[in-house]
Amino acid sequence: MPLYKSQSIKIYNSLSGEKEIFSPINEGNIGMYVCGPTVYSNVHLGNVRTFMSFDVIYRYFLHLGYKVRYIRNITDVGHIVDDVDHGEDKIAKKAKLEQLEPMEIVQRYTVDFHNVLKAYNLLPPSIEPTATGHIIEQIEIVKTIINKGIGYESNGSVYFDVVKFNESNHYGKLSGRNIEDMLANTRDTDGQSDKRNHQDFALWKKAEPEHIMRWPSPWSDGFPGWHLECTAMSTKYLGSHFDIHGGGMDLKFPHHECEIAQGEACTGQEPVNYWMHANMLTLNGKKMSKSTGNNILPSEIYSGGSPFLTKAFSASVARFFMLQAHYRSNLDFTNDAILAAEKGFYRLMEAIGSLKNTAQFTTSNTTSIDIKAWKQNCYDAMNDDFNTPILIAHLFEGVRFVNVLKENKETITTEDLLDFLTTMNAFVFDVLGLEDEKLATNNNDKLDGVVEMLIQMRKQARDNKDFAMSDQIRDQLLALGIQLKDSKEGTTFSI
């Protein structure tokens, strides 16, 4: 029997403002969509925290035995500077500044995004679709919304009529806004805008002559509005009604509000059952900002190349630090805080290392520690809206168990010892996604040794003029992602 049948999860639903018992549309299966990055610059540490939060949620669902289709998109067109309808596409602007093609910018920062998430041990999603790969689907949604009488064309652009939509729906329900208040608090453009109402948002934008990224449509050569892509990709891969939609708190309005409106306009029903939002990461009590210099790149954590840090920290320590706060809570990053987290992380890893060496524990016919209650406490923490700080507190109770068992102050049966070890491993490594650095270092050392041995074999083959064998070793290593570089000084490799 899968674990999920014995556990009841409560999720804080941003739409209702309450914790609700999670009940997937199809038993045993979960459809989850998370808004991914706009790839025009390096992701910052706050982005990593958001994606890490949903990584843990994804991991926990998998641990419980759910079959999860996890979609996380890449925004590579349509995201206008300052998140408005008029202006320059963020990627196109970056391309002009660096005198590159837009897709060169997309490729560069998509690779950076993947490298960062890999370093922080995030699992890849089931599908990672791009906005540019779904232009046809977006055009079809625009047609549907126009046919429903809620979208309108104006000078080659198409807009969503929020006033018309609000006649039979509630635009603003996710963010707690009222359409009348929004309209009253916006300036009259005196006919200067293509929109009927200032709050109307773009479904399709006509491209200016100098705009690089453009596609043909029934209305104009142009590009889709930012909000449209997520509706198109989520419905394509998860259907018009799915379980969970997540993202950063900053996306609640207007992005997610507009997604709800688009979905309801197309189908007449709520597109998503549970809306989830992860909170911000600040630096020394202030918002992270590149323009003010109050910013740390994810790579600066483990390189130590930041003026805000006194030393380098492993990505796993940074992950542990961020999971010590609940995903809906604001978290302030400071040097002192991550130093304290590092100490806790090593205590936890040391305890698990001891626990794996079961020979040092004397087992008994009885267990004086309530392992079953402790185990359920771990599940209860995650079942309560994925409360990682409470889970970590229970894991440190497990650290205490390890210490008293080593000192023979408590007793444990062989069966309970195995259950204890299995549970600690499951929550620390599988659910929280932490990595044992000593094990990783040992594995890296072994890999280095194997590659160096193959380099020497290749050198010997070349000395013997067996160039076919030399090339075979080089090509097979390259197929595994290991590139050899020959120079006068010898051969080195990179991964």
UniProtKB/Swiss-Prot annotation:
One of its GO terms (molecular function) is cysteine-tRNA ligase activity. It is found in: Cytoplasm. GO terms for cellular component: cytosol. Its main location: cytoplasm. GO terms for biological process: cysteinyl-tRNA aminoacylation. The keyword Zinc applies. CDD domains: CysRS_core. ATP binds at K290. Zn(2+) binds at C35, C230, H255, E259. A motif ('HIGH' region) lies at residues 37-47. The keyword Lipoprotein does not apply. SUPFAM superfamilies: Anticodon-binding domain of a subclass of class I aminoacyl-tRNA synthetases, Nucleotidylyl transferase. Keywords: Aminoacyl-tRNA synthetase, ATP-binding, Cytoplasm, Ligase, Metal-binding, Nucleotide-binding, Protein biosynthesis, Zinc. Its cofactor is Zn(2+). It catalyses: tRNA(Cys) + L-cysteine + ATP = L-cysteinyl-tRNA(Cys) + AMP + diphosphate. It is an enzyme of class 6 (ligase). Pfam families: CysS_C, DALR_2, tRNA-synt_1e. Its EC number is 6.1.1.16. Binds 1 zinc ion per subunit. Monomer. Belongs to the class-I aminoacyl-tRNA synthetase family. This is Cysteine--tRNA ligase. The gene is cysS.
